[in-house]
Amino acid sequence: NFMNSRDGWVLPKGTVEKGETYEQTAVREVNEEAGADVRIRAYIGSTNYSFKAGHKNIDKIVHWYLCESDSYDCVPQKEEFFYDAGYYKYHEAYHLLEYPNEKQILSDAYTMYRQLRKEGNW
């Protein structure tokens, strides 16, 4: 989770760069925003949202992945106005998140994680 000055606590996300896959973007953005090296374990799903930039409406689709890391080191990206970051237990993270769609993604990710553990795949 990341805390920024505009939106409160949010999950990491970003824009696909030319030649990148969604998976590569996810790994890069987590590294850039938190300094964390992660591996993708599963695709969770996608969400849509819209916002205004000046007089223009912007529509975004975000693809979400369940990832794992060997470290709990986390350094927020100050240049992007993130001023806190961290790893939290599911229930703590759920209550910190600002947006309902991100809470749903977290819930879906937790369900998937528990299933992978149950199957011996985590």
Where are these regions (language model features)?
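Unchanged
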Residues: V16-Q104
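N-terminal strand-loop-strand
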Residues: N1-P12
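Charged phosphate-binding loop/patch that engages nucleotide di/tri-phosphates or the phosphate backbone
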Residues: H95-W122
